[in-house]
A protein has these predicted regions:
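Flexible domain-boundary/linker segments
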Residues: 45-46, 59, 130-131
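Non-catalytic cell-wall polysaccharide-engagement segments
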Residues: 62-185
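Poly-acidic low-complexity segments
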Residues: 1-4, 35, 70
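N-terminal export signals and maturation junctions of secreted/periplasmic proteins
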Residues: 1-22
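Glycine-rich, acidic and aromatic/proline-enriched surface loops and short helix-turn segments
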Residues: 1, 45-49, 115-122
Length: 185
């Protein structure tokens, strides 16, 4: 639903601007130090629900959170209440002033969310999908995870691989594989 799509948003000065999601992801990558492929794949994992559908967390129309967007579902902790995870994420996106919050338009949500991902995960050692799910780094070991879904590293890696298309064979790959000591043989 975001491929070759544009959107109109109102910036903090009240000026309306039009841009594409592609340009927004490139801006987000530049400002966060995170790959645009990773950012787009993360958003696809988190909020794209089908060929034309997206989660209500990016609609700007959720009751009580009108005009608030969260493309990465940051803070969308699991909840037993219907719509609770979306409400938790939108509440997070609406409070505080770090990472361009409150995320009152798509641009701020995508770029600010990328800055959050870079500052709190990718650029501080949790730079693989595995480490974002299973934190075995020296910082906050076992506690600082990005995703609740046990299958997220696998499914998101498939989306990232698809994003690179056929160009993967010419790329230099660097593998980061945690090695565990004291494991049974």
């Amino acid at each position: 639903p975001m491929y070759r799509a544009s959107y109109v948003y109102t910036d903090d000065t009240g000026k309306e601007s039009s841009t594409t999601y592609s340009k927004t992801f490139m801006d987000a990558a530049s400002l966060s130090g995170v790959s645009p492929y990773h950012l787009a794949s993360r958003v696809k994992q988190e909020v794209v629900t089908g060929p034309t559908g997206m989660s209500s967390s990016v609609s700007g129309t959720v009751a009580g959170y009108e005009g608030i967007y969260n493309f990465y579902n940051i803070g969308a902790n699991n909840s037993t209440k219907a719509g609770g995870a979306v409400a938790n994420g939108l509440s997070w996106a609406n409070k505080d002033t770090t990472y361009m919050r409150p995320w009152t338009n798509q641009y701020k949500a995508i770029v600010g969310g990328a800055q959050y991902l870079g500052s709190n995960y990718i650029n501080v050692g949790q730079n693989t999908l595995y480490l974002q799910k299973f934190n075995v780094t020296a910082n906050n070991t076992y506690n600082h995870q990005y995703m609740a879904n046990i299958e997220a590293p696998w499914s998101e890696s498939q989306k990232t691989a698809d994003a690179y298309g056929t160009d993967k064979s010419d790329m230099r790959l660097v593998f980061s594989i945690p090695v565990y000591s004291g494991m049974p043989s």
